[in-house]
Amino acid sequence: MSFIQVTKEEFNTHAQQVSERSFMQTEEMAKLLEKRGFSISYVAWKEGNQIEVSAIVYSMPMTGGLRMEVNCGPIHSSVAHLSDFYQCLKDYAKANGALELVIKPYDTYQIFDSNGEPISSEQKQLISQLTDLGYSFDGLQTGYPGGEPDWHYVKELSGIEEKDLIKSFSKKGKPLVKKAKTFGIKLKKLKRDELSIFKEITSATSDRREYSDKSLDYYQDFYDAFGDNADFMVATLNFQDYFDHLESNQAKLRARIVKLQADLETNPKSEKKQNQLRELSSQFETFDVRKGEATAFIDKYGQEDIVLAGSLFVYTPQ
């Protein structure tokens, strides 16, 4: 049993054996970090010839020494010697001149439902396992400490086919998707020379959410490092297309209203149809309001596709 440095190939072999892994612990991320000026090393705990725990460790000079970090790691196929790994990692950091060693484990401390209510107990041993070895705990944080969130929203997709995806959404989510489909929103995958569009979105978001944004060249380096394993996506809206969608859907609504009015001429006392007519008439008026808004945007933007939102999708085997 031993704590050792391993090759990139050995790390990748072990990484394929674990059930959970963040993109932060991938060969692509190591390539990106090296491009950004970090020193990279692959370390592991071995039992015999078998790696049980491994991690990408990256370092950056600070006054008087190095700052060393394991982000979203280590990864492990067995937790039996996880404490041994953490202890040896301290020794490794000290031997290599690190003044600060930061570990951000990729373990779930507690699970909450969509309403913010806990549905699992706190896994306090995840913290004590490190503090018992002399590590300091920064506390459970909110927001974007260090430019990244500690809270992750995870949707379980196992067993869900594409045709059933919307059915799995919440009561609030289903009508929002239905409404969005009437807008004529289009998705676009950005090319490398279009990443300034993505940067404009992240800059605006970071100002609004009060966290530090990455630079444009960081996103370009990310694009280069991850290749087909990452997509920079944006949602766009052409307001003329949006107006045309509104016109089409309002016309369908008008046909339903005309039919209801004809039915009420035959059966004017039908309370059910009267209620339906009131509801559809209200929806019809809403379309008029939305068309007025769309017209104002057409006057401003013409036929231009306007970017509404963007997101970076990163793919890992796990």
Language model region names:
Residues 3-64, 135-146, 156-318:
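A conserved beta-strand-loop-helix scaffold within acyl/acetyltransferase catalytic domains
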Residues 64-145, 304-309, 318:
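Acyl-donor binding region in acyl/amide transferases
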